Regions:
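Helix N-cap at the start of a conserved alpha-helix in ABC-type nucleotide-binding domains
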Residues: 91-93
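Conserved ABC ATPase "signature" region
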Residues: 33-51
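Conserved catalytic motifs of ABC-family nucleotide-binding domains
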Residues: 76
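Conserved ABC ATPase signature
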Residues: 55-59
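Conserved beta-strand-loop-alpha-helix hinge in the C-terminal portion
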Residues: 136-163
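Catalytic Walker B motif of ABC-type/P-loop ATPase nucleotide-binding domains
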Residues: 80-83
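H-loop/switch region of ABC-family ATPase nucleotide-binding domains
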Residues: 116-117
Length: 174
């Protein structure tokens, strides 16, 4: 299981992009040759080729988030958990990151679990949804089914993507 927390800066431990990715690989016992290959592959996967020797402070916030994603992906987890991964990004950066995660999901076949307050960015990608309230699961299941069950509950309706609130509102009216 690979995890990327919302406070991505707190997960960074190295000076350069390459060292950041290498750190967890070396701790997992990979050989230096395997580490080098995985560092290059991971940087390529997240759209940061040739940034291996960049200092972390030379990277933008969005690039550092993608670097952290690369360091998680380099271990090739079966499950990737992202906790508010776009919290510090502008809308274009958020859409770009989720499109990247979708490409990686399809290329590597890993399960992706996203904890997110703004589901609008996830709409093109999500297949299942879990809505929680005060720490308890209120609705879960395939996305459309869960959205339809959540809509009548006012406290959950606000959490649905805007397009689905409009769609379900029109269906209820007509």
């Amino acid at each position: 299981v690979g995890i990327m927390l919302d406070d991505y800066e707190s997960q960074m431990v190295s000076l350069t992009a390459g060292e950041e990715i290498s750190f967890s690989l070396l701790n997992h016992g990979f050989s230096p040759d395997e580490v080098d290959a995985r560092v290059k592959e991971a940087l390529n996967d997240v759209g940061l080729p040739d940034r291996e020797n960049y200092q972390l402070d030379e990277l933008s916030g969005g690039q550092r988030q993608r670097l952290l994603l690369a360091s998680v992906l380099a271990t090739r987890p079966d499950i990737l958990i992202l906790d508010e991964p776009v919290s510090a990004m502008d809308p274009d950066g958020a859409r770009s990151l989720y499109a990247l995660v979708d490409r990686i999901h399809k290329a590597h076949g890993m399960t992706v679990v996203v904890v997110e307050h703004d589901l609008n960015y996830l709409l093109p990608y999500m297949t299942h949804m879990v809505l929680m309230e005060t720490g308890k699961i209120k609705v879960q299941g395939p996305f459309e089914e869960a959205a339809r069950r959540a809509f009548p509950q006012e406290s959950l309706r606000a959490n649905l993507p805007e397009l689905w609130r409009i769609k379900l509102g029109l269906e209820a009216k007509y």
